[in-house]
Amino acid sequence: MTDANGAPAEAAPQIRMQVLAQYVRDMSFENMVAQKGLQGGDVQPDIQVQVSLDARKRSVEHQYEVITKFKVTSKNKSGSAETLFLLELDYGGIFHVENVPEDQLHPFLLIECPRLLFPFVRRIISDVTRDGGFPPLNVDTVDFLALYRMELARRAEAQKAAQPVQ
């Protein structure tokens, strides 16, 4: 592309992102029915997955920590509706991010970074549920863009509700 004088237009610097580390920050798995066992086909699980995200700047320039928090609850749909298991997982990543405009950094960190972490989160959840005595749970893909938009709408609503009526 050229400008009006025929000189090449200066290209915007290319966004650079590098995953420096990934780790389980915190994890808990509670098997509520371990003593009872899961004999028979009378168990119909109702799986609920809650996802939240957090990002913060680190002391090193261009480095950010992004944490994905998953809370997975399985209840028995039939009969008593007792909780079968509860899994809580905080999975983090350290990212080196450069050349992202300041006004786009927050959505970038809370959409693109969790997208890269998600396959590892899914694998951990699958392995832990299997190792906990249940069939492996393959969590559906999370739409992090929709999750980000819902959080923005929730914050806007909360801010609107907090403003005094004139």
Curated annotation (Swiss-Prot):
<keyword id="KW-0811">Translocation</keyword>
<comment type="function">
    <text>One of the proteins required for the normal export of preproteins out of the cell cytoplasm. It is a molecular chaperone that binds to a subset of precursor proteins, maintaining them in a translocation-competent state. It also specifically binds to its receptor SecA.</text>
</comment>
<keyword id="KW-0653">Protein transport</keyword>
<keyword id="KW-0143">Chaperone</keyword>
<keyword id="KW-0963">Cytoplasm</keyword>
<dbReference type="GO" id="GO:0051082">
    <property type="term" value="F:unfolded protein binding"/>
</dbReference>
<protein>
    <recommendedName>
        <fullName>Protein-export protein SecB</fullName>
    </recommendedName>
</protein>
<dbReference type="InterPro" id="IPR035958">
    <property type="entry name" value="SecB-like_sf"/>
</dbReference>
<dbReference type="GO" id="GO:0005737">
    <property type="term" value="C:cytoplasm"/>
</dbReference>
<keyword id="KW-0813">Transport</keyword>
<comment type="similarity">
    <text>Belongs to the SecB family.</text>
</comment>
<dbReference type="GO" id="GO:0015031">
    <property type="term" value="P:protein transport"/>
</dbReference>
<dbReference type="InterPro" id="IPR003708">
    <property type="entry name" value="SecB"/>
</dbReference>
<comment type="subunit">
    <text>Homotetramer, a dimer of dimers. One homotetramer interacts with 1 SecA dimer.</text>
</comment>
<dbReference type="GO" id="GO:0006457">
    <property type="term" value="P:protein folding"/>
</dbReference>
<dbReference type="GO" id="GO:0051262">
    <property type="term" value="P:protein tetramerization"/>
</dbReference>
<dbReference type="Pfam" id="PF02556">
    <property type="entry name" value="SecB"/>
</dbReference>
